[in-house]
Structure formats: C-alpha cells, structure tokens
Amino acid sequence: MGQIQYSDKYFDDTFEYRHVVLPPEVAKLLPKNRILSESEWRAIGVQQSRGWVHYAIHRPEPHIMLFRRPLNYQQEHQAQIAK
C-alpha cells in the first residue's frame, strides 16, 4: 500500500496551504465531487494538526486534496487555550 504524501506549506496574504497526495487505494475511497469534512479526511488516514480545511477539488487530479487554514492559526488557537 502506498503512503499519503504531504507537501510543504505555502502561503499568501491570508492563508497557509498544503496539498496531500493520496495513493490510489486511498483515493478510491473519496466521495466524488465534494469537499470532505475534517472527520471524513481523518477517517481515510490524512493526519494534520488542527485548523486545516479541505477547500477545493483539483479536477484533473482528484487524488490530490487541497487544504488551507488562516495564517497564524496555531498561535491564535494556543492563545485561546491559555485563557
């Protein structure tokens, strides 16, 4: 069985992004033409820290999942926990 591959993070002014490449045997578990919730992508084996959202489907290559989260998410999340 192939392994799930994670890209490095990349950024714009609002979000940090990463893409996740699924091996064929995992990709076939994806529902067609819809965004997955966090519980769904975790259930198929994608492992990431909190805050990531599956936000788009790359139609030419549906086995590549596109994720984003707001810049500074982790710092803001940790500050809320500390309160």
UniProtKB/Swiss-Prot annotation:
One of its GO terms (biological process) is cell division. SMART domains: CKS. PROSITE patterns: CKS_1. InterPro entries: Cyclin-dep_kinase_reg-sub, Cyclin-dep_kinase_reg-sub_sf. Belongs to the CKS family. Interacts with CDKA-1, CYCD2-1 and AT4G14310. This is Cyclin-dependent kinases regulatory subunit 2.
